[in-house]
């Protein structure tokens, strides 16, 4: 009995000891000054404890191992924390005010009266916030490399630090190798911590102020208000401007510092809730600790929780990722030795892509290789991460990809005559189709069953739902349609009720309502099949789908169908034969386009033009056809494609989609449910898009 009581007592003590620890947030700090501030916070708020490490990398390792839970990092370190070997993610962003701005400006600052500009920095002395940091290293050095001021062939040639050492006469870049030219101007141990007096924004400015350096790469707020008149910004065009002109004279806008932690939603919520509940302690002040920007930047005004799907790549954006990659590039090689990694969605597309790869082999190499993903959105993520390079997508997906910093580079052309003499931009008509004699019109759709190509796609969702939203001003489309199939919808949604899956005896339900070709009602042909098989009353598709799938042109399930058995629903409430699409349609919309990262545009265009000459509609090699699909319809490209045409360099996704489409999307985006988690993550910052 005594033994049982003792065991019970020990169990209670263990529980009592573990409970507070479970709720405690272990904050990682990098200096004695930060440790003092953290201890003061922990004394006020018992839910915090402090873990001391030597630097950001050591903190990242400690968080991965569970020794610590969180730290605030700048963009360069957020990139490192998100790499596969660490697997951390940003969970909370600093907000610097000015209408909730989670971005800041990276600038180059010099003393007033010194006679040089950004284009004449060679041989000058430089002050950096730290090696690998956003404003202090990645942005300025990336810009100098991109502009060919710093000549660097790649890491196979030599480290970028070596090229920077040759460019500047001397520097202080905390975190560089002690004894190197990059540490020559430093005042302390050149460590990436407050042990080095010239570390971080305040330190880099002090390096400039003390006369150690000629230029400091910092943020504008690092220059004290009382001293602004003595300093100037160096603009990228070679001119100078006042410190307060940073909005027009800067190197880049970069994502705010963010709190990173392990990929654990419960832990992320706990950290955020504990931080916002802090009272009687100023998280955003470092007064009294003999340093600045401790734990958080002093310029932060509040904290903003990030969408749960946000990872470091989505947080930083394609443009900033491109800058970081430019500093980690391998030695450049000719385009002829490169292969572009095409992203295929689902097994059927992967099969066609593999065939494309095999047929593209020449001289021991192929110009195309294949990656696969379960959805287009996952492909967009892969392209952002450089795990894939390109994919052809619908206009709605061009919109999402554009929000994520990717660019449209080639467009499908459906008119063979325009392949040799292009006129206006390639386009198609979004139409509403019903069975002839159904009595259905555009005005009587409410309460009916709907067939969509996919959630967020142009003809199948964005255009019809955008029009319906303009009429009803109601974002709950389940009140409008009784049920339907819109692949990509939440499982259990009325818009999954009519989906079919793959039809396979095993695993068929796994594909049900998924936005991939295994779902038999996915895509243009799938939405039409949904109508044909009486799973829906109306199909929202492209104008060519009915003739392509009927009168003996379609697959087995459509072999007995006649195009005359179907009709178009016009917006004025009338109906028309399917041949009258130019008069009876919901919208004229841009064709599907190939998207990629900004820095791979040239390679993707040149290789696709080369492959098109070989495997296009009138290509020289008939062993493979890029624009034909044998197993299923519209794999990799739409089967109606006659050629791919280059989109003029510099064309923004907004210009490609056109004013009408953008207006429709902006209307639809008033409905938060119509915005994907990916798009929400990509549009969290105002600075993720290229200016």
UniProtKB/Swiss-Prot annotation:
Binding-site residues, hydrogencarbonate 2: 453, 457, 459-460
SUPFAM superfamilies xrefs: Periplasmic binding protein-like II
Residues involved in hydrogencarbonate 1 binding: 129, 134, 136-137
Primary location group: secreted
UniProt-recorded name of the protein: Serotransferrin-2
Gene Ontology MF annotations: metal ion binding
Record-level GO cellular component terms: early endosome; extracellular space; plasma membrane; recycling endosome
Tissue expression: Abundant in liver and serum with smaller amounts found in the stomach and kidney.
Glycosylation sites: 169
Keyword Secreted: yes
Domain Transferrin-like, residue spans: 25-329, 340-670
Binding residues for Fe(3+) 2: 394, 428, 524, 592
Quaternary structure annotation from Swiss-Prot or TrEMBL: Monomer.
GO biological process, one term: iron ion transport
Subcellular location: Secreted
Disulphides: 28-50, 127-207, 172-186, 235-249, 343-379, 353-370, 404-682, 419-643, 451-530, 475-671, 485-499, 496-513, 570-584
Gene name tied to this protein: tf2
Keywords: Disulfide bond, Glycoprotein, Ion transport, Iron, Iron transport, Metal-binding, Repeat, Secreted, Signal, Transport
Positions contributing to Fe(3+) 1 binding: 74, 104, 201, 257
Iron among keywords: yes
Domain of life (superkingdom): Eukaryota
């Amino acid at each position: 009995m005594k033994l049982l009581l003792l065991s019970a007592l020990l169990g209670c003590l263990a529980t009592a000891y573990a409970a507070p620890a479970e709720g405690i947030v272990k904050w990682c700090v990098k200096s004695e000054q930060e440790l003092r501030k953290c201890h003061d916070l922990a004394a006020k708020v018992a839910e915090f404890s402090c873990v001391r490490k030597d630097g950001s990398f050591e903190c990242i390792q400690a968080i991965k191992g569970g020794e610590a839970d969180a730290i605030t990092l700048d963009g360069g370190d957020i990139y490192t924390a998100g790499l596969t070997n660490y697997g951390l993610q940003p969970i909370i962003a600093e907000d610097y005010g000015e209408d909730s701005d989670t971005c800041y400006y990276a600038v180059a600052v010099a003393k007033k009266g010194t006679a040089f500009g950004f284009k004449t920095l060679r041989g000058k002395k430089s002050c950096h916030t730290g090696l690998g940091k956003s404003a202090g290293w990645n942005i300025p050095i990336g810009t100098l490399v991109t502009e060919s001021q710093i000549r660097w062939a790649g890491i196979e040639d030599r480290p970028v630090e070596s090229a920077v050492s040759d460019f500047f006469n001397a520097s202080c870049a905390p975190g560089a190798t002690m004894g190197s030219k990059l540490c020559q101007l430093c005042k302390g141990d050149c460590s990436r911590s407050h042990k080095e007096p010239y570390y971080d924004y305040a330190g880099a400015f002090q390096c400039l102020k003390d006369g150690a350096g000629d230029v400091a790469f910092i943020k504008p707020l690092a220059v004290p208000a009382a001293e602004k008149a003595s300093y100037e910004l160096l603009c990228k065009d070679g001119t100078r401007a006042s410190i307060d002109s940073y909005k027009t004279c800067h190197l880049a806008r970069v994502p705010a510092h963010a709190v990173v932690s392990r990929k654990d939603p419960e832990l992320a919520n706990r950290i955020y809730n504990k931080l916002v509940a802090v009272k009687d302690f100023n998280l955003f002040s470092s007064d009294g600790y003999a340093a600045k920007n401790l734990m958080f930047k002093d310029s932060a005004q509040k904290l903003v929780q990030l969408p749960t799907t946000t990872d470091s790549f989505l947080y930083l954006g394609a443009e900033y990722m491109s800058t970081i990659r430019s500093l980690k590039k391998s030695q450049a090689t000719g385009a002829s030795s490169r292969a572009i990694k095409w992203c295929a969605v689902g097994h059927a597309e992967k099969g066609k892509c593999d065939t494309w790869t095999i047929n593209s082999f020449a001289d021991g190499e192929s110009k195309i290789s294949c990656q696969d993903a379960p959805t287009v959105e996952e492909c967009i993520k892969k392209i952002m991460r450089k795990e894939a390079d390109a994919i052809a997508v619908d206009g709605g997906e061009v919109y999402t990809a554009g929000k994520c910093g990717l660019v449209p580079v080639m467009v499908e052309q459906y008119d063979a005559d325009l392949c040799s003499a292009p006129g206006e931009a390639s386009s198609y008509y979004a139409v509403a189709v019903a069975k002839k004699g159904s009595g259905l019109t555009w005005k009587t759709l409410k309460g009916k069953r709907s067939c969509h190509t996919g959630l967020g796609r142009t003809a199948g969702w964005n255009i019809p739902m955008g029009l319906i939203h303009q009429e009803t001003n109601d974002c709950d489309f389940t009140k409008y349609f009784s049920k339907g199939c819109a692949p990509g919808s939440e499982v259990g949604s009325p818009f999954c009720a009519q989906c079919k899956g793959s039809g396979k005896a095993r695993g068929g339900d796994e594909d049900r309502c998924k936005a991939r070709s295994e779902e038999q009602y996915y895509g243009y042909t799938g939405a039409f099949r949904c109508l044909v098989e009486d799973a829906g009353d109306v199909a929202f598709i492209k104008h060519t789908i009915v003739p392509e799938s009927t009168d003996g042109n379609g697959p087995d399930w459509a072999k007995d169908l006649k195009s005359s058995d179907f009709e178009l629903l016009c917006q004025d409430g009338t109906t028309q034969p399917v041949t009258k699409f130019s008069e009876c349609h919901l919208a004229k919309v841009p064709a599907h386009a190939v998207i990629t990262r900004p820095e791979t545009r040239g390679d993707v265009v040149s290789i696709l033009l080369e492959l098109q000459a070989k495997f296009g509609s009138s290509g020289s090699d008939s062993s493979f056809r890029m624009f034909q699909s044998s197993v299923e319809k519209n794999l990799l490209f739409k089967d109606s494609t006659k050629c791919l045409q280059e989109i003029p360099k510099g064309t923004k996704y907004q210009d490609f989609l056109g004013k009408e489409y953008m207006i429709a999307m902006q209307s639809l985006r008033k409905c938060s449910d119509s915005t994907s988690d990916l798009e929400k993550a990509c549009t969290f910052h105002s600075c993720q898009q290229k200016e």
